[in-house]
Amino acid sequence: MTTLSGAPLAGQVRFAVLTPDGRLIIHSAPGRASDTEWGPYQEQLWAAVRAEVDPHGGDINGIELHNGMRAKLADAAMAATTPGHYLPNPVASVVLASLGPPPTARHGTVAIVGTEDDQGRTTSLTTHQLELINHVYRLATQTPQ
């Protein structure tokens, strides 16, 4: 687990990743947004999230979590039809259930991103959000502080 202290580098957006082998990794990606007909789009951030969550090019779904966070995960139907690509992720299942959505089995790598601001841009996970994720992760893995 990487450190939770300090702010991200200027222009970077921090997000958390829960891997099927039980790791919690904090990543960052450029957060610059381009204007599109649908609003601002953070191409580099979403490419980094997609590379973690679904490198096989399937659909990605989003789930609203507590404290303004959102989870990004591989489409459940895609994960069910190609289980070799999307391994069971019991730690993510527990972490997400603790952060809002009903308990269900999750598969593949799961990303947790920060709050969407009034302009539609996803912000970096705050120190408080990272501490909450880390706390729930420790409980899910029975890791002492």
Language-model segments: residues:
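Short beta-rich binding modules
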Residues: 1-145
